[in-house]
A protein has these predicted regions:
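Short amphipathic alpha-helix that is part of the acyltransferase structural core
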Residues: 5-52, 70, 167-169, 176-211, ...
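Short active-site oxyanion
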Residues: 25-26, 119-125, 184-185, 278-284
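Conserved active-site alpha-helix within GNAT-family acetyltransferase domains
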Residues: 123, 129-157, 282, 288-315
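Conserved acetyl-CoA-binding loop-helix of GNAT-fold acetyltransferases
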Residues: 96, 102-115, 127, 255, ...
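A conserved beta-strand-loop-helix scaffold within acyl/acetyltransferase catalytic domains
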Residues: 53-65, 71, 77-94, 211-225, ...
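Hydrophobic adenine-recognition pocket in adenosine-nucleotide-binding enzymes
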Residues: 30, 94-96, 189, 253-255
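C-terminal "cap" of GNAT-fold acetyltransferases
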Residues: 148-183, 307-333
Length: 333
């Protein structure tokens, strides 16, 4: 496994914002161990009507979208970047411990999230907020909520104020429209990779080997994916989806049909396993027809009924449910 890739998992883009923080405070990507503290901080602000509350399940499933600041093991602030499509992402769940407000923590988190958006290749980032002055200082400009595409309202449907939202909409255009270079080898997925990822996955889905993926699903879950790229083209991909503090699923592992059997899928799975360890997950599982392939990495077959019910959420959309003919395989990390 490329050590540079592992190092990249340990730091949030925009760590130069560290200089904005109080002495001893650390800006970094969230990990599984942060889930309970993130939920508590977000819901403290939600109880005051400042943002939507988050269930622990929602926090764990979106843990890679979060950046946090901590000091001596205490969470000082958090914020998340959620992709909406190839041209738009949202900053959400931005919360700072009241004891640390005004210390530059919120600004450092937002600047890190914007740096992440630039690296992914997202040209615009918006926020729905009551803190318009704060976002204006960071280069955001106000817009009418009606100017935002309808797809961003999915999350808002759960809000008690919907459709009479009283938050202001702010948006910023980012200078780097292309994202980081599409380097050859195994790496985290970028916005520009999604069309080719969809083509590869849906080719195998048409043959009954996995679930199909809509572009909207791939954009919203882009942080789950790794790809193997060659000459700026995706030839393999796969995702690690966090389900809870103790379990993640390897899914959508697919290789371009003309490149199967050359080790590209293995390279992606190795990256997914390494990321699972870096996040702090104790166990991974996969539903698969490829027993031999996953056995190479230490996965073992288990009874499907031994897995918790929460793993079946996505299966409800499968035409084979509940008569699944895939094997359940697990790996203890």
């Amino acid at each position: 496994m490329n050590t540079a890739l592992l190092d990249a998992m340990k730091e949030a883009p925009g760590v130069a914002r560290q200089s904005l923080l109080p002495n001893g405070s650390v800006l970094r990507p969230a990990r599984i161990k942060d889930g309970v503290r993130i939920q508590a901080l977000v819901n403290e602000h939600a109880s005051k009507g400042l943002m939507l509350p988050r269930s622990l399940n929602q926090v764990y499933q979106s843990i890679r979208e979060f950046t946090v600041v901590e000091h001596d093991g205490q969470l000082q602030g958090c914020g998340a970047l959620q992709l909406a499509w190839d041209d738009l992402a949202e900053i959400r769940s931005l919360a700072v411990d009241p004891k640390w407000q005004g210390a530059g923590i919120g600004r450092a988190i937002v600047e890190s999230l914007l740096a992440q958006a630039e690296e992914l290749g997202v040209p615009r980032v918006f926020a729905l907020t009551y803190q318009g002055g704060f976002f204006a200082k960071l280069g955001f400009r106000p817009i009418e909520r009606s100017e935002l595409p309808r797809k961003i309202w999915v999350d808002c449907i759960d809000c008690l104020k919907f459709p009479h939202c009283d938050e202001e909409a702010f948006i910023v255009d980012l200078p780097n429209r292309g994202g980081r270079p599409r380097q050859d080898g195994v790496r985290k997925a970028l916005v520009a990779d999604v069309p080719e990822m969809a083509e590869i996955i849906n080719h195998h889905a048409a043959n009954g080997r996995m679930l199909p993926r809509a572009l909207s699903h791939l954009y919203r879950n882009l942080r789950d994916f790794w790809v193997f790229s060659e000459e700026e083209h995706v030839i393999a991909c796969g995702a690690l989806h966090v389900l809870w503090e103790d379990l993640g699923e390897i899914r959508a592992v697919a290789v371009a049909p003309e490149r199967i059997g050359r080790g590209f899928g293995s390279a992606v799975v190795e990256a997914l396993i390494a990321e699972g360890r870096a996040l702090g997950l104790p166990r991974l599982f996969a539903f698969t027809y490829e027993k031999g392939f996953f056995s190479r990495f230490g996965f073992r077959v288990v009874d499907k009924e031994s897995l918790p019910r929460k793993v079946w959420g996505e299966c409800l959309d499968c035409p084979k449910f509940p008569n699944c003919d895939e094997l359940a395989m697990v790996l203890d990390l």
